[in-house]
Amino acid sequence: MTKKSTKSEAASKTKKSGVPETGAQGVRAGGADHADAAHLGTVNNALVNHHYLEEKEFQTVAETLQRNLATTISLYLKFKKYHWDIRGRFFRDLHLAYDEFIAEIFPSIDEQAERLVALGGSPLAAPADLARYSTVQVPQETVRDARTQVADLVQDLSRVGKGYRDDSQACDEANDPVTADMYNGYAATIDKIRWMLQAIMDDERLD
């Protein structure tokens, strides 16, 4: 009769096989390890490669995807905050416009995160990660004034649009035309929203 393995023996075999005992990502809650590492010693990650990218190319592309993911989430939150904060004669116009702009950029959040996963990475989106990677800052204070809001958003959108164009070129040079093409599309959307807000800001009644 074959002797059944004990739990301790099973655990020993698990350790020898390299499969972690601490969950699918192999990290303990609150531990020092980060779930963003593409090469954690887990069964799942052992099956993941960077598709057609070399390691250096992947690092370049992954860096842009993580930064742009954090930036887009922050931009979404900023539009929402200003949507709630706005007061005055332009309340209804901007209150509704901000939600329309959010609807245009929101899909790119999931698209960028899933693109990173498809290439063998793991997106970070905790509050601390947003603060670390995002190029857009969400104000902690209440901002009621329409011109202050719009001018701030125009400045952010100008920077984000340029970032997408720069990152598109970087990804193209890193042998990833797919991500580069994604960024070109996002840049066009950001440019359109910036143009619309700039047109609103040019209205003298905004003061």
Curated annotation (Swiss-Prot):
Coiled coil: none annotated. The 12 subunits form a hollow sphere into which the mineral iron core of up to 500 Fe(3+) can be deposited. The homododecameric forms at higher concentration of salt, the homodimeric form under reducing, low-salt conditions. The assembly of the dodecamer is irreversible. One of its GO terms (cellular component) is cytoplasm. Keywords: Cytoplasm, DNA-binding, Iron, Iron storage, Metal-binding, Oxidoreductase. PANTHER family: DNA PROTECTION DURING STARVATION PROTEIN 1, GENERAL STRESS PROTEIN 20U. 12 di-nuclear ferroxidase centers are located at the interfaces between subunits related by 2-fold symmetry axes. It is an enzyme of class 1 (oxidoreductase). Residues 1-31 are annotated as: Disordered. Protects DNA from oxidative damage by sequestering intracellular Fe(2+) ion and storing it in the form of Fe(3+) oxyhydroxide mineral. One hydrogen peroxide oxidizes two Fe(2+) ions, which prevents hydroxyl radical production by the Fenton reaction. Both oligomeric forms of dps exhibit ferroxidase activity and DNA binding. Dodecameric dps is capable of Fe(2+) oxidation/mineralization. Only dimeric dps affords efficient DNA protection against hydroxyl radical-mediated cleavage. Residues 1-12 have a biased composition (Basic and acidic residues). Fe cation 1 binds at H83, D110, E114. The gene is dps1. GO terms for molecular function: DNA binding; ferric iron binding; oxidoreductase activity, acting on metal ions. It catalyses: 2 Fe(2+) + H2O2 + 2 H(+) = 2 Fe(3+) + 2 H2O. The keyword Metal-binding applies. This is DNA protection during starvation protein 1. GO terms for biological process: intracellular iron ion homeostasis. It is found in: Cytoplasm, Nucleoid. The keyword Iron applies.
